[in-house]
Amino acid sequence: MFAITAITVFSAMMLTSNTKAQAAAKKTYTITPKSSPYKGKYKKAKGYYNSTTKQYFAIRSYLELLEKKGGGKLVIKKGTYKIPNVLYIPSNVTIELKDGVTIKKIMKTKAKKMKPGGGIFELLEPSKAKKKGVYGQYNGVHDVKIYSTGKAVIDQDYQGKTGQNCIALVMCHNRNVTIEGITFKNMKYGYF
C-alpha cells in the first residue's frame, strides 16, 4: 500500500512538473484597441472586415492562434473593444484584462456578410464553433482563466426586451474555469 501511494504521488508530481513546464513554454500575446488581426488574418475578408469589426477579428485571430498552439495567454490592454459576434475561447488559455479595459457588446457590424451574434465569449474551440454535439459531460474546454489586473468591465449593453439582449459568457461541459475581478454591466435580461 505504501509503495503504491508513493508511486501515485510521484506520478502526480511528474504530471504537475510537466504541466508547469508546458505552461511556462506557452507564449503570451498582447493587443490594444488599435491592434490588427494576427499576421493580417481576416484583413482581406471582403464583406466581413471593416472598422467596426476590426477589434473583434483581432481578438478572434489570437484566440484561434492559441487553439493551434495548445494554449497560452492573451493580454488585452486598456481601452474599449467593441464586439459584434461571439469570441470562442479554447482550452489552456488565460485572458488578462488590464486596468481600464471595457469589452462592449455591439449589435452592428456594417459588414455585408456578417450579422451580429447574441454573445460575447463562449468556451469552445474556435475550430469546433460550427459543429453540433461536440461535447458532453465534462469533456469540453478546460483550464481557462479570465481575470482583470485592475478595473475591467464586460458591458452587455442591454437595450430592452425588443432591443439588444446578449449573453456575456457561455459555458457548457467545461471544467477548471476561473473568472476574477471583472464587472459585468448592463445585464438586465438574459443570462450571464
Regions found by a protein language model. Give the residues of each.
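Extracellular/periplasmic carbohydrate-active domains that bind, remodel
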Residues: 3-6, 17, 24-192
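Juxtamembrane cytosolic interface motif at the C-terminal end of transmembrane helices
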Residues: 12-16
